[in-house]
């Protein structure tokens, strides 16, 4: 419930922010909410679900995250061309599902395990478990929890997980969690429209391609759920991470091969007349890196026009294999979905 409240506050405040500091604080609040939800939701599902459904329901938690990302891409595509500050609507619309989530959580029962372990409310927990899986399931689960309490009283310590017999398990668990984030998947999801725009696409086509990214993620998450019990987790991890490596190398090659060309045709595409006039002297020049380009262009424009160039005009000059970028990103997302996702 607290997490859902943080989502609602973050979305509303982000949309209404009047300054940079306010906006950053609002986004941090949302980040705290996301961190909490990612941790709490699967734990709650694991505690409340019957054993035969536990694996599937935890998988569906990830599937719902993927569906949410896809819905966000669709929403952004339809909102991007709104008059005024469309970004406010893109962020503010999140408050609707966040509020629904907040209200719906009041109907969700507390974790039976938590009720027994923390409050010793055995009868309350039994009623909840009976509704979920019947009386037999409730009796068996309560007995398991009671045995867990007895074992807990044997003075197990947190430091025990660092003992040598648990070392391999700890390394694997921490390694997967670390590499899941360090691969940069969140940057790809968050900046997908920007990546495609910098690859030479228009704003509309960039947001449309981001939808394709979301749908690819959704489809291959479903594939992973279907394959995980057939092939096992380790083969999927090996296959997925191998193709992720290939995809990142493809994207690196595409962006590293990009050039920025100034000629009559590319200059004609510039909408801002003052920028076009100021950059006419660069006609015939080609830049092989963005930093080199910015160093030169910055000497031709004042600060405001330079920012406008970076935000809106730079894509007019880039020459890049956009198809290779799209294939690389889609392969990367698909590979992540079946392995680390």
What are these regions (language model features)?
Residues 1-133, 137-341:
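Transmembrane-helix signature of 12-pass secondary carriers
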């Amino acid at each position: 419930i607290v997490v859902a409240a943080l989502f609602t506050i973050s979305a509303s405040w982000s949309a209404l922010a009047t300054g940079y500091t306010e906006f950053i604080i609002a986004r941090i609040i949302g980040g705290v909410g996301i961190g909490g939800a990612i941790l709490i939701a699967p734990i709650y599902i694991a505690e409340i679900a019957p054993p035969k459904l536990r694996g599937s329901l935890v998988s569906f938690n990830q599937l719902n995250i993927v569906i949410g990302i896809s819905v966000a891409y669709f929403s952004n595509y339809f909102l991007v061309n709104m008059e005024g500050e469309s970004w406010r609507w893109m962020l503010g619309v999140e408050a609707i599902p966040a509020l629904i989530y907040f209200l719906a959580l009041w109907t969700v029962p507390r974790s039976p395990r938590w009720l027994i372990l923390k409050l010793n409310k055995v009868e309350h927990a039994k009623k909840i478990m009976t509704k979920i899986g019947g009386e037999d399931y409730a009796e068996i689960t309560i007995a398991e929890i009671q045995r867990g309490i007895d074992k807990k009283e044997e003075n197990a310590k947190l430091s025990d997980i660092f003992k040598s017999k648990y070392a391999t398990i700890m390394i694997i668990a921490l390694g997967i969690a670390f590499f899941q984030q360090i691969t940069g998947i969140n940057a790809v999801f968050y900046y997908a429209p920007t990546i495609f725009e910098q690859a030479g696409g228009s704003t509309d086509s960039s947001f449309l391609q981001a939808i394709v990214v979301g749908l690819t993620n959704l489809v291959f998450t479903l594939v992973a759920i279907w394959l995980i019990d057939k092939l096992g987790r380790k083969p999927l991890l090996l296959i997925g991470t191998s193709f992720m490596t290939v995809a990142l190398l493809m994207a690196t090659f595409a962006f590293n091969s990009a050039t920025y060309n100034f000629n009559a045709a590319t200059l004609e595409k510039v909408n801002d007349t003052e920028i076009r006039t100021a950059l006419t002297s660069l006609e015939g020049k080609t830049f092989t890196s963005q930093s080199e380009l910015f160093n030169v262009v910055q000497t031709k424009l004042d600060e405001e026009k330079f920012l406008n160039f970076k935000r809106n005009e730079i894509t007019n000059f880039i020459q890049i294999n956009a198809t290779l970028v799209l294939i690389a990103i889609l392969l990367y997302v698909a590979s992540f979905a079946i392995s680390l996702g």
